[in-house]
């Protein structure tokens, strides 16, 4: 058996355009924007161009819009793209909103997708400090749970796992059953 020191559920909302994102975080029906510590975006100038992808974090719990905006060093250059998709993520349990845990999740996400993330250069060699497992849940902008066959060129695994022996595992649940 393997010892998993940290297990987190991340709830992702998206895909959103930039206007939808701004409207979503300001919405009165939205969970508190300060709960969102993670963001992922992908963009391409047009259908002939390759996708550019970036995953990032906002360690302060003062609203994701303070980080993911037109002044962002990577995001700003893609605002004029024809295809721009944004996902924002929060811990399912807000007690996990601590800087070290946010950073650990970011490192796992970057390691899992480093070959597809074109804009994450600094953290590609950095590993989580201990074993960690992430369960991703996907929601649309109305906060309805989505099935797991969602069109995403990247970043679509339900489970991500890192073991201290430099073992990475990732994948999707083959079948999700809803007991309604």
Give short role names for the model-derived ranges.
Residues 1-53, 57-180:
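Boundary/linker segments flanking structured domains
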């Amino acid at each position: 058996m393997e010892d998993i020191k940290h297990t987190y559920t991340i709830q992702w909302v998206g895909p959103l355009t930039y206007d939808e994102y701004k409207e979503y975080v300001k919405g009165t029906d939205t969970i508190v924007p300060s709960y969102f510590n993670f963001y992922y975006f992908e963009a391409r100038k047009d259908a002939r161009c390759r996708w550019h992808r970036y995953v990032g974090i906002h360690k302060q719990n003062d609203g994701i819009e303070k980080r993911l905006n037109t002044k962002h060093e990577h995001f700003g250059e893609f605002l004029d793209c024809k295809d721009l998709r944004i996902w924002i993520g929060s811990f399912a349990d807000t007690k996990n909103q601590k800087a070290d845990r946010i950073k650990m999740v970011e490192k796992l996400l970057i390691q899992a997708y480093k070959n597809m993330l074109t804009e994450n250069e600094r953290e590609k060699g950095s590993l989580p400090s201990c074993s960690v497992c992430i369960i991703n849940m996907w929601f649309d902008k109305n906060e309805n749970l989505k099935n797991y066959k969602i069109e995403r060129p990247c970043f679509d695994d339900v489970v991500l796992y890192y073991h201290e022996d430099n073992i990475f595992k990732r994948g999707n649940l083959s079948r999700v059953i809803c007991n309604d």
